[in-house]
Swiss-Prot record:
Keyword list, A-Z: Cytoplasm, Lipid A biosynthesis, Lipid biosynthesis, Lipid metabolism, Lyase
Designated name of the protein: 3-hydroxyacyl-[acyl-carrier-protein] dehydratase FabZ
General function of this protein: Involved in unsaturated fatty acids biosynthesis. Catalyzes the dehydration of short chain beta-hydroxyacyl-ACPs and long chain saturated and unsaturated beta-hydroxyacyl-ACPs.
Disulfide bond positions: none
InterPro entries cross-referenced by the UniProt entry: FabA_FabZ, FabZ, HotDog_dom_sf
HAMAP family (alphabetical): FabZ
EC number(s) stated in the UniProt entry for this protein: 4.2.1.59
GO BP, one annotated term: lipid A biosynthetic process
SUPFAM superfamilies: Thioesterase/thiol ester dehydrase-isomerase
Species classification: Bacteria, Pseudomonadati, Pseudomonadota, Alphaproteobacteria, Rickettsiales
Species for this entry: Ehrlichia canis (strain Jake)
One Gene Ontology cellular component: cytoplasm
């Protein structure tokens, strides 16, 4: 499955300037997702990080991973309303930042469910630019059905 930005906006609660996924190029619900973030000089975080040497903050790369995880577990192919669910992140472990991400880069984020139990999922996440690993992390999340 693939999702464009209009579909993503309907799926997850994030909006500008905190929506960090531009499109999903592959998604197998509850298994894996590959998402894209086109990093431009117009991103608001580049104003202060860092003037004259813009680098995407590592915490925002992890946030992009978390948003891809959210899409992975709330997307479905059965027509259910994805807004019926919320995803809460419980932990981020083994986060490593290997190379800087700069304006003009296309960040490819791949998340894979490595363990699922009841309403929790563990993900292995990788972010690449031009087939080079720039960041990785393990994320643990809880999926909760929203009350009506």
């Amino acid at each position: 499955m693939q999702f464009n930005i209009q579909e993503i906006i309907k799926m997850i609660p994030h909006s500008y300037p905190f929506l960090l996924i531009d499109k999903v190029i592959a998604c197998t619900p509850n298994e894996s997702t590959i998402a894209v973030k086109n990093v431009t000089f117009n991103e608001p975080f580049f104003i202060g990080h860092f003037p004259g040497n813009p680098i995407m903050p590592g915490v925002l790369i992890v946030e992009a991973m978390a948003q891809a995880c959210m899409i992975c577990v709330i997307s479905n192919d059965q027509g259910q309303n994805t807004q019926d669910y919320s995803v809460y992140f419980m932990s981020i472990e083994l986060a490593k930042f290997r190379k800087p991400v700069i304006p003009g880069d296309t960040l490819i984020i791949e998340v894979n469910v490595t363990h699922k139990r009841n309403n929790t999922c563990k993900f292995q996440c990788h972010a690449q630019v031009e087939n080079t690993l720039v960041a990785e992390a393990q994320i643990l999340a809880m999926i909760k059905q929203n009350e009506a």
